[in-house]
């Protein structure tokens, strides 16, 4: 006869999630709630994980920010996404400071990759390239500079 398997505790469930990837406290709480775990039990488990440094919102913020930079997103979009995780402002600021990226260079590389040898002196293509960077989370100044820089490179 098979023994009935004991349900994992809130702590065990949260730890199992953290083994796969970093999670914010809010995210873990939401996932535990979805599994039917009481809020009190979830908070106790999350406090314990935080004390043991298995769950750390500052580390989560930095990992997420680095991931988004490598995916080609700009600072506005990254900061907005970090904001959706209910992270402390200090954690978001520290994560943005830690990535130390030259945003103008990143935007320039994205345009070079996406538009290759297309003529960016054509106003319609330049507008599309600028809009692409704006949607990716770069500010207007950087987007305009990157498309202007690329159009000058092609004309030389």
For the regions a protein language model found, what residue spans apply to each?
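An alpha-helical, amphipathic repeat domain used for nucleic-acid recognition
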Residues: 1-156
């Amino acid at each position: 006869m098979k023994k009935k398997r004991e349900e994992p505790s809130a702590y065990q469930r949260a730890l199992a999630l953290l083994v796969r990837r970093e999670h914010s406290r809010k995210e873990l709480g939401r996932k535990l709630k979805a599994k039917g775990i009481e809020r009190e039990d979830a908070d106790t488990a999350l406090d314990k994980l935080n004390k043991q440094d298995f769950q750390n919102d500052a580390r989560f913020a930095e990992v997420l920010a680095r991931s988004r930079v490598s995916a080609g997103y700009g600072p506005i979009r990254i900061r907005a996404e970090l904001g959706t995780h209910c992270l402390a402002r200090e954690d978001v600021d520290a994560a943005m400071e830690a990535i130390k990226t030259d945003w103008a260079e990143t935007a320039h590389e994205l345009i070079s990759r996406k538009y290759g040898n297309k003529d960016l002196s054509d106003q319609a293509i330049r507008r599309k390239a600028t809009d692409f960077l704006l949607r990716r989370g770069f500010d207007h100044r950087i987007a305009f500079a990157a498309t202007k820089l690329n159009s000058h490179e092609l004309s030389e």
